Amino acid sequence: DSQDFAAKVFHADKTYFVLNGSSASNRVVTNALLTPGDLVLYDRNNHKSVAIGALIQAGATPVYLETARNPYGFIGGIDAHCFDEMYLRQLAAERDPEKAKQPRPFRLAVIQLDTYDGTLYNARYVVDRIGHLCDYILFDSAWAGYEQFIPMLKDSSPLLLDLGKDDPGIFVVQSVHKQQAGFSQTS
């Protein structure tokens, strides 16, 4: 009952409580979705658990999205040109020319919705720009999880998006123990 209640509160179709934090949740999602050779759009801000789950355990092939760095070396958001379809298809073609020609060349995009350093993406923008190229998008919201409860952040919440029939499946991982009131590495 508590998972159903949480799904309702967070505006999710389903909610699963996972122990061992978002590291475990990221591996659950990536290992459920990916097989060897699948192309994955990969945000450089992603947590190591995604690299372990998606790239090592599942054997998927990364297509890295470049990120900005400030003068102090902090990684910022994904560079704007990385949301261009022609550019992404070109990157896909470098790894798998046949998949690059498919309507959805990427099995999964993994986006660090909010970074350790404070970058918070507009989820609507991400889905509108790359969603049609992906079967699924995993938004790792480990450092937030509160965006759906703050009106001015509603566009940052993948859980509040009105999705169309052509949009990808959406997964959101949250670290309830970081920014919310969860116990011991609850995700």
Name these PLM-found stretches.
Residues D1-S25:
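Conserved N-terminal alpha-helix of the aminotransferase class I/II PLP-enzyme fold
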Residues K8, S22-T35, L39-S187:
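Conserved PLP-enzyme active-site core in the AAT-like
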